[in-house]
């Protein structure tokens, strides 16, 4: 069938890909046909003429005849087939810009190689290394039946006879004296005649063996009756000793059924499970005492041993968290009496230290309404995290809010290797194993939602679902509700939720996309589930991408296809793919990206794994490298990988990797790799934190290890306005000002904007913008003051500030989208203009940028405090030291890894955002310190795949400002004013590349001179001034040498996806002074539909080194200390000033004049102000990268 498709029909390729293919062809009259992106069943005819691409829309009518859309008055011609239409327009002067001459063929693909590999892998999997030796499951899949049905078709009778005779001989050699005579006769009858009949069933493709089932039913007839009679007694005994049974749970009624083998297996499994669990429950009951019988599915009290300083002396303390009673109990000894306790209402905030990962500050309110600051040191960071999670659970459980504003989500992915799972898989759901794992103290905290994705899953849906629910009940003592289950062949996704959330979940949607052989067979692909949780949209995608280390590009294409064709979420958001349809999108699965190293380094790789030198291997991880190059998972995030590669193990052990695999084409190498991954993407300024990311160590039936990840995710409730619809203060308004889009296209068609949001009654369409020429290959579309004012359905700030506006820029001729973005409405202040920015993407590719200003008008009111505001992260001097360490790192991956991850580089402070995806604003829109705006000649093309900086002042969805931790949204209200670090105003510093570090240091010195606290020196000792002694020139150069070690970052002008948006007055000045400012269109010009220009020489404009002189700040290489300065002299005076020694002072040791001069010089104090210049902390205004998230 593929031969029937004409070579010029490229199907569902993107518009940008079509332009690329035609530009590559380079001949006038080259053409191709692609599917329309805006109209179903329509096509787009793309023609190249004089290095320009012209696009004509081919529309079907009611009779399925095709016609080329023409201007008014032009007669329309209809064709029954596309071939006829193309042949007609190959003639000259038929109305096109030129006649069709040279069809652009499809790109060659190695589909045969992939098909051969997949077929060989499925057929030859049993003898591959390591040997599987896995029993067949009760319900074999079609893939398993295929080898049996096609095996040796030329001599079926000989095979059957030999098999029957062999089995008879084996039966005769066995001791059958203990078998009942009727059972023995039934077995012999089956081997003599019925075995052949079952073989015929297999030959027809059926997976059913009716005669074997009949034989087993006969053999188990008496056993079935005995099990039915025994099970109720055992269940009653189990309930008697079950202290965690929910009160409404009743025993299942025993329905007598047929004694089938499947029923017997289930009953026997239930029987053995009951026998083993009864003994465990009795032991637990005797150990815990009778009082535990009243504790059903409650979280037991957990005690933490901590240290607390009193008058400088560390003392051991014990903190007991009782979630159910809502108390934090402080005791001096574990078994002693309570010294004091604090109720959940009196515990105001938890503040984590970044310098000491096991230190925690607890702010509590006393009876006299005073706020106390209690500092405790835990045994390790995991204990601290477990304590924080328990207290957060306590606050959530006793919250007065009827609806949650934060939920926890478990994500699990496992390639089961076509093997049945082990009986016990609870470690997976407890996040136990390698990597970032959960503490034991958090075991009793159930997650709100469990999402489990599997690949090569041999079980049926019911069997797998029963195992999952049984395992979760064992872990949480809760029976979870099934939200959705969806399967594409052996790729499956299951979503389970707490029973209490049943009425909060709605709009459930499932879909799948096949990306296997010829995109028709389901051996590879993806399954997805989406739903609404109150007012928040959630999406989950489980994918199994093409295998093979050399198939990296095909995996990228798999991802793009899934992105385009997976139909989930709100159907009204048709211009947007799944990356913009959901507040939170989680992508999991066997992505099959490998560690790209030579095969002869296999043993060296294994040695690095044993030594846990994962960073050396991650530098060659295909997925991280492809994301760095912006080729896949654009704007997604992934938690830091701290666990061993999850593929390819020998089965039944995790101590040995099996990296060789015998194929029909020869030996194949599968180097140990992180094939199984979890990534996520959330809307701007939405709370999301990854709490764990790792793999299990005790589930070994597959050659993959299961991977787990857990998240805190912010959610919103279904909001009902407190204001009446006619009241004056309920008139909200969203106004966009001075907006413009920069697009990577040569099309001269007009463009308009569409605004979509759940806070709008329907989408809003703008007028056409004015086109201006940008740099090479770019078009600037300005919308000025013509954009419509948006009217939200609810104007309460508590609702509106949590909303987002989706933007799509579309062609007026074809209505096809050229880019989509997202703007957050969470602004520092309303009634004022704020700068906004969002990258524009289309089908997973970067297509441009959208900039402008926004003004939001809301009704009276304020936002309430969120539950995730309860836990903060305190910034201290550790952030600077750690980032300086990163600056000198030789690890190439450090140059683009995120700096927001704790404890890597400290940018997550009380006023910063751990969530790297998004940016915040400066306080009330004020300009930020350490900022330098690019000159117009540095603002080059906004379309660049060059490496981007990690963090910046601009990020998706907002304007300028430093990152803000997700644990504290910018508008979170405060119940109190504490003296914690950074609570007051402090200078904020943007991130700078190593190359720009000198400029930022100079700016920081001036800022710190103005904000630094004064200190008095003790005259009996040496100066504590931060000014250095006279040192050799080489030592003065040391900071600069350190900055040269990492690979250089690109020029600020090249990474233009993050060019800073100047303020309004700056925009005007740029218009008037810049030579590159685009010239406005003076008058209307005739335009041809979808006129698209391209050039064979598509070189990107680059600029020379625009870096300015960088002042050397040698003081930054040491820890300076401030001194008291009664009078602030000028810099020239400081260099000459000497201070006389006061007369009343006693005689002092003689000091040199240099010491006296330095003693009265103003230095920088990093002890109180931690804004150290370091890599990953200061950035130019560039596009923002997430935690391992690439723009």
Swiss-Prot record:
Organism, scientific name: Mus musculus
PROSITE patterns: SH2 (PS50001)
Positions carrying Phosphotyrosine: 918, 945, 1021
Motif annotated as NPXY motif 1, chain positions: 915-918
Cellular location(s): Cytoplasm; Cell membrane; Membrane raft; Cytoplasm, Cytoskeleton
Enzyme class: hydrolase
Signal peptide residues on this chain, from the entry's feature table: none
Tissue expression pattern: Specifically expressed in immune and hematopoietic cells. Levels vary considerably within this compartment. Lost during erythropoiesis when erythroid cells become Ter119+. Increases substantially with T-cell maturation and when resting B-cells are activated. Also present in mature granulocytes, monocyte/macrophages, mast cells and platelets. Isoform 5 is the only form expressed in embryonic stem (ES) cells and is coexpressed with other isoforms in hematopoietic stem cells, and disappears with differentiation.
Predominant localisation class: cytoplasm
InterPro entries, alphabetized: Endo/exonu/phosph_ase_sf (IPR036691), IPPc (IPR000300), SH2 (IPR000980), SH2_dom_sf (IPR036860)
KO phenotype (gene knockout): Mice are viable and fertile. They however fail to thrive and only 40% survive by 14 weeks of age. Mortality is associated with extensive consolidation of the lungs resulting from infiltration by myeloid cells. Increased numbers of granulocyte-macrophage progenitors are observed in both the bone marrow and spleen. Absence of Inpp5d leads to steel factor-induced degranulation of mast cells. They also display increased numbers of osteoclast precursors leading to a severe osteoporosis.
Skewed-composition ranges (Basic and acidic residues): 1032-1046, 1162-1184
Ranges of compositional bias, category Pro residues: 962-972, 1141-1150
Sequence motif NPXY motif 2, residues: 1018-1021
PTM: Tyrosine phosphorylated by the members of the SRC family after exposure to a diverse array of extracellular stimuli such as cytokines, growth factors, antibodies, chemokines, integrin ligands and hypertonic and oxidative stress. Phosphorylated upon IgG receptor FCGR2B-binding.
Annotated GO CC locations: cytoskeleton; cytosol; membrane raft; plasma membrane
Recorded consequence of changing residue 1021 to F: Strongly impairs function, tyrosine phosphorylation, subcellular location and interaction with DOK1
UniProt remark on domains: The SH2 domain interacts with tyrosine phosphorylated forms of proteins such as SHC1 or PTPN11/SHP-2. It competes with that of GRB2 for binding to phosphorylated SHC1 to inhibit the Ras pathway. It is also required for tyrosine phosphorylation. The NPXY sequence motif found in many tyrosine-phosphorylated proteins is required for the specific binding of the PID domain.
Protein name per UniProt: Phosphatidylinositol 3,4,5-trisphosphate 5-phosphatase 1
Keyword Lipid metabolism: yes
Record PTM Phosphothreonine, positions in chain: 964
Phylogenetic lineage: Eukaryota, Metazoa, Chordata, Craniata, Vertebrata
